[in-house]
From Swiss-Prot:
Native source species: Escherichia coli (strain K12)
A GO BP entry: regulation of DNA-templated transcription
Entry keyword annotation includes Cell inner membrane: no
Organismal lineage: Bacteria, Pseudomonadati, Pseudomonadota, Gammaproteobacteria, Enterobacterales
GO CC annotations on file: cytoplasm
InterPro entries: Sig_transdc_resp-reg_C-effctor, TraJ, WH-like_DNA-bd_sf
This protein's name: Protein TraJ
Reported function: This protein is essential for positively regulating the expression of transfer genes that are involved in the conjugal transfer of DNA between bacterial cells.
GO MF assignments: DNA binding
Keyword annotations: Activator, Conjugation, Cytoplasm, Plasmid, Transcription, Transcription regulation
Tagged with keyword Translocase: no
Length: 229
């Protein structure tokens, strides 16, 4: 029974990952959707339906009607699947429904298969941050964990930067290159970060931070680190 128990446990974790991600983006304050490797839309949140779809139109038909965007997003998805340096890609200034959007495309490993998360942000808000009053609330428990990590003598002063980059889906190879540290240092810090947040891997960490409504702050920090290196 033990091998079967392991298979059942692995299958349950895969279901939990997809269910948790679906539950999180359902209440997300931006249009968002999940696709599988075949291009099938597994889930679209309410704002995605309200922003892009008509009552009798499927997400697949809507995407095919957006010819330029369809080609661009397909290429971006392939990059998210294949690029060893990062599993997060941004598509900027896409014009849909009379608005410009910046779209984050992020891959998650669900068992042996990848799923892709799209999130749509108002491009004007992303581009003109100074004039955008973004309400970012960082919960006390997140602040306390970040503070404790910073004070941990077993890691370097780069631990917070590793946290912000790692939590947005960026690989250890890319983190090492951006921060000019070794890959082993990045992995060591990531392991400690997961321990502090009581998760076992990157996907669980990202979903936890989505659930904490921490993602806006996280992306801003990560982009700031990348742009200043």
């Amino acid at each position: 029974m033990y091998p079967m128990d392991r298979i059942q446990q692995k299958h349950a974790r895969q279901i939990d990952l997809l269910e948790n991600l679906t539950a999180v983006i359902q209440d997300y304050p931006n249009p968002a959707c999940i696709r599988d490797e075949t291009g099938k839309f597994i889930f679209c949140n309410t704002l995605f339906h309200e922003s892009f779809l008509t009552q009798d139109q499927s997400a697949e038909k809507w995407l095919l009607s957006q010819r330029d965007f369809c080609e661009l997003i397909s290429v971006t998805e392939m990059e998210a699947y294949r690029n060893e340096h990062t599993h997060l890609n941004l598509v900027e200034d896409v014009f849909i429904q009379n608005r410009f959007w910046t779209i984050s495309v992020q891959s998650f490993l669900n068992g042996h298969r990848n799923i892709i998360l799209w999130q749509f942000y108002d491009a004007a808000h992303v581009r003109h941050k100074d004039s955008y009053n973004q309400k970012t609330i960082v919960s006390d428990d997140i602040r306390n964990i970040i503070r404790r990590m910073s004070d941990d003598s077993s890691v370097s002063s780069y631990v917070n930067d590793v946290f912000y980059l790692y939590s947005t889906g960026i690989s250890h190879n890319a983190i090492a290159r951006i921060l000019n540290i070794s890959i082993s240092t990045s992995k060591k810090h990531a392991s400690l970060i997961c321990d502090y947040f009581s998760v076992s891997n990157k996907d669980e960490l990202i979903i936890l931070l989505y659930n904490k409504k921490f993602i806006y702050y996280l992306y801003e920090k990560a982009m700031c680190i990348i742009n200043t290196r």
